């Protein structure tokens, strides 16, 4: 009978340790791994958010540059039209002056 009691006590103690938490030396590395994994995920999330923000800013800057380029081109076209009009007015004035001079001489 004592043998059975000893056997049951031994069995109970040995099976109880399997259901309990792991020993302290095994928990520390897993805890450290969890901390590292969580921190690493946060860093990766921040990097991807930063990259997305930079892409958005680069697109907006590109659009601004295109708008400024369009304004410059439009300004050049307007300047070109104005210059052409001035040149035509000057040419017509010179032609009329030459005709008047020829008429007065002839």
Curated annotation (Swiss-Prot):
GO molecular function, one term: neuropeptide hormone activity
Leucine amide sites (modified residues): 74
Keyword terms, alphabetized: Amidation, Secreted, Signal
Bridged cysteine pairs (disulfide): none
One GO BP: positive regulation of lactation
Pfam assignment, any one: Hormone_2
TM segment ranges: none
Record's GO cellular component terms: extracellular space; perikaryon; terminal bouton
Coiled coil (UniProt feature): none
Major subcellular site: secreted
Propeptide intervals in chain numbering: 20-30, 77-106
Residues spanning the signal sequence: 1-19
Localization per Swiss-Prot or TrEMBL: Secreted
Function as written in the Swiss-Prot or TrEMBL entry: GRF is released by the hypothalamus and acts on the adenohypophyse to stimulate the secretion of growth hormone.
Family: Belongs to the glucagon family.
PANTHER family xref list: GLUCAGON-FAMILY NEUROPEPTIDE (PTHR11213), SOMATOLIBERIN (PTHR11213:SF6)
Stated name of the protein: Somatoliberin
């Amino acid at each position: 009978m004592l043998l059975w009691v000893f056997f049951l006590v031994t069995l109970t103690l040995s099976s109880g340790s399997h259901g309990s938490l792991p020993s302290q030396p095994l928990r520390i590395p897993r805890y450290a791994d969890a901390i590292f994994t969580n921190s690493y995920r946060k860093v990766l999330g921040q990097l991807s958010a930063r990259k997305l923000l930079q892409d958005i800013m680069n697109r907006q800057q590109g659009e601004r540059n295109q708008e400024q380029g369009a304004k410059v081109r439009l300004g050049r076209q307007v300047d070109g039209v104005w210059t052409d009009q001035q040149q035509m007015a000057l040419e017509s004035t010179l032609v009329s002056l030459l005709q008047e001079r020829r008429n007065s001489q002839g």
